[in-house]
Amino acid sequence: NSLINDFSKECEVISQQVDQFVELSSPCIVYAECSNTVQGEMQTPVNSRPKLTRDEIFSYASKISEIAKWCSDRGMPMAYHHHMGSIIENEDDVNWLMEGSSSDLSLCFDTGHLLFGGGDVMATLDRWGDRIHHVHYKDIRPDIVKDIRENNKSFLDAVIAGAFTVPGDGCIDFQAVSNSLAAMSYSGWIVVEAEQDPAKAPPYDYSKMGYEHIVKVCKMADLSIN
């Protein structure tokens, strides 16, 4: 909540989790702005999410950089998660955040959220590869995303309708993504995310589908999975 909390307050709020993650030897703490977001509001269209100007995001990035350095000094890298419905949603938002922040702040690169937000997955990956510390492999169903946008529906409507799905079940080329990660010697986590209605998409079946697809594309990219 860095838009509404000052530096000291925000550090106080996240300190317990940061310390816990250090104790657990976690790869990073994933951070996203949870104030001024519409992602949890069923009646608010995702198209109505708050938007900041370039200068406003640069100012925000400076503040986030201080928090990221505070985390780093405690032994925990901080990776920023761009998210639908929030102030950092589309490709411009991500570019401005990265341009305006210090190297203390890394990026949690989420394929599904970026494409849903209208961004270019490969261009963003190639541009900010050296800042990516954590990766979310999430696919989307473009027809559902199109319906959500055109009919002014909410982010939660999108989740329930099945806008997101596991890798290999949507439209994102995860072979190309994996090839780029391998080329940049990425060695962090790849997390599968695909929040959707379990009545329509049985969790075990879809988890298995996503896992098998990731194993296949990573093997072809010579990206080892440990």
Can you say where each PLM-predicted feature lies in the sequence?
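Histidine-acidic metal/acid-base catalytic patches
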Residues: 25, 65, 69, 91-105, ...
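Active-site acidic/histidine proton-transfer and metal-coordination neighborhood
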Residues: 6-106
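A near-ubiquitous, low-amplitude feature marking generic local secondary-structure context
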Residues: 43, 47-50, 77-80, 111, ...
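The substrate-binding groove and active-site-proximal loops of carbohydrate-active enzymes
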Residues: 1-11, 51-54, 113, 163-169
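Active-site beta-loop-alpha junctions enriched in small/polar residues
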Residues: 1-5, 34-36, 83-85, 110-114, ...
